[in-house]
Amino acid sequence: MIKQFQTELAGKTLHVEIGKYAEQASGSCMVRYGDTTVLVNATASKSPREGIDFFPLSVDYEEKLYAVGKIPGGFIKREARPSEKAVLTSRLIDRPIRPLFPKGYRNEVQVIATVMSVDKDYAPDIVAMIGSSIALSISDIPFGGPTGSVNVGLVNGEFVLNPTSDQRAISDIDLVVSGTKDAIMMIESGANEVTEDQMLDALMFAHEEIKTIVAFIEEIVAEVGKPKQEVQLFAIDETLDMEVRVFAKDKIVTAMKTFDKMERNERLDNVKKEILVHFSKQYENELKSIVEVINSIIKEQFRYMITHDKVRPDERALDEIRPITSEVGILPRTHGTGLFTRGQTQVLTVATLGALGEVQILDGLGEEESKRYMHHYNFPPYSVGEAKFLRGPGRREIGHGALAERALLPMVPSQDDFPYAIRLVSEVLSSNGSSSQASVCGSTLALLDAGVPIKDMVAGIAMGLVKENDKIAILSDIQGMEDALGDMDFKVAGTDKGITAIQMDIKIKGIHKDILKDALEQARVGRLHILDKMKKAIDKPRPELSPFAPRVLKMKIHPDKIRDVIGSGGKTINRIIDETGVKIDIDNDGTIFIAAESQEAVEKAIIIIENIIKDPEVGQNYTGKVIKIMNFGAFLEILPGKEGLLHVSNIAHERVNKVEDVLEVGQEIEVKVMEIDQQGKINLSRKALLPKESKAENTKEEKA
């Protein structure tokens, strides 16, 4: 049976259709907001997946180029691997729903959101997130939602719900929030140095709207929702659990109290081996269950130490930040480098400057066609002491790179002020938590070292949370164990004036305003501390670019002159490139960017272009080059791309019978512009510059 539902969201109609499409999926809905339409399907396996100790949830956000009336490029003409935007949106969908499945649920669950149509004023990512919650909620899959999701902007000091394309362009906040009716589950935001209070107000504004969406979804579930399936949850035998705890608890607690991550891991591994050997005969077929009990003990003891003893594994105070060192100028031939070390987390970020023609071309569903500022994050296995195959960047690496990119973006100078493409690559050399925020700090150092005139320095910090009933501990600068065993990973980046990026993921069923407020304030204090440490290495951009960086200059010409610079079939611009070795990029408004390895090459290209766009003037003298000889005269190039006719009667005072007797191709002579007619044709005279006693037969002495 086909059912339709609708509600108002930000003054616009959100329309949901159920029962018409994909009837074999466990839960399916077509969600339309404006003209943006997304089909979302949720399915689950009938039985648990064997041999795993995690919940196998997969989320895919599919961008179909037909949604914006495009045919994919390339030879195959079909969508290839997901774009960066698609990967990031898949993560946005995944993060708020993952904590809401039952503990011990091991059935495979797949959510697929397919973008069918896109209206630029109605963001498809928000529609897909709402649709995913609906599909799971109406299905028979045991999901503890529903959740709601919104986008919040800050335009002229006012919060705007689900801003339009034009509003997003001028907004000081780009905030995506997901949550249940009770609490916030996920935050993703970029911002233009907003204060902690402004960000908190934006989050509370978002949550009020989320409650409305959740109520709407609950109405849908009440009418068309399926009964939830009875599922088999993974559980450990109580006797085994008790025996392992009695034998192992004290050993694990002793092993955990170690400052160094590698030493702690080694001691815990040795304890695990001892425990497994001890129970190997008694529970020969339950070794995986024993490992799970061990991991549970580690988690419980960690959380008890934090909430009751107020002691962290490395003996830091809850708000204490690990020792920090910063260096710049590490690599001799790169354009800029920054090495940021915080405890056992170390990131080397390298900045590369390029011509604007080297921007990243985006072929997706968004309005952006290119990206001038890029950040790539690499997490090799040696950074955590492992040996694995090297593969392309995964979703985590793409997500961390995008977060660091977003954190610095408001500080990057405009194209007019700094006409370069900028690429940053963060190599994680050692990781014990907070590597993405170390990448933010390394990026700032590398940009300053490269001489990029960023508006201000940016630092990042990762905050954690451990919540046991009414006991709450907020942790500054979390390390790996605290990230893995805690309840929250709350990353905050910004300047000393305000926040530029936020990302929050939680493992519990939401957090409330007071926790968010305290975490934001504690993050602010930590961020300022980190900035002070970074300033000891470098506190302003280098006055000069690296000698190995390209030189880029820009010039402005009248848009009507663009065709003259490019020439027929690109002949003129290619000739300039061949002669000077520069790279040239031309905007439609007549702005020309010229890049080369040397200043001399750039200046040479500018002179050539200036001559090309220069218009001949009547009465002015020019050195012309003979390019073609005809019976009635000769054609001369007097400026690049500018040709004029020297009629045979204007070659000399005397009569010239054959032009070839006086001129030859390639010869350079002085001529005067006598006339430019209405069609732009130029008439030249050599005779006007010759004394009357001059003899035509002597003129070949002038030939070059």
UniProtKB/Swiss-Prot annotation:
EC number: 2.7.7.8
InterPro entries: ExoRNase_PH_dom1 (IPR001247), ExoRNase_PH_dom2 (IPR015847), ExoRNase_PH_dom2_sf (IPR036345), KH_dom (IPR004087), KH_dom_type_1 (IPR004088), KH_dom_type_1_sf (IPR036612), NA-bd_OB-fold (IPR012340), PNPase (IPR012162)
GO molecular function, one term: polyribonucleotide nucleotidyltransferase activity
Necessary cofactors: Mg(2+)
Binding, Mg(2+): 483, 489
Keyword NADP attributed: no
Record's keyword terms, sorted: Cytoplasm, Magnesium, Metal-binding, Nucleotidyltransferase, RNA-binding, Transferase
Domain S1 motif: 619-687
Reactions performed catalytically: RNA(n+1) + phosphate = RNA(n) + a ribonucleoside 5'-diphosphate
Record GO biological process: mRNA catabolic process; RNA processing
Cellular component annotations (GO), alphabetically ordered: cytosol
Family matches, as SMART domains: KH, S1
Location within or outside the cell: Cytoplasm
Record-linked Pfam families: KH_1, PNPase, RNase_PH, RNase_PH_C, S1
Residues of the signal peptide: none
Family: Belongs to the polyribonucleotide nucleotidyltransferase family.
Role description: Involved in mRNA degradation. Catalyzes the phosphorolysis of single-stranded polyribonucleotides processively in the 3'- to 5'-direction.
HAMAP family assigned to the protein according to its UniProt record, in alphabetical order: PNPase
Protein name as it appears in the record: Polyribonucleotide nucleotidyltransferase 4
Species in which this protein is naturally found: Alkaliphilus metalliredigens (strain QYMF)
Organism phylogeny: Bacteria, Bacillati, Bacillota, Clostridia, Peptostreptococcales
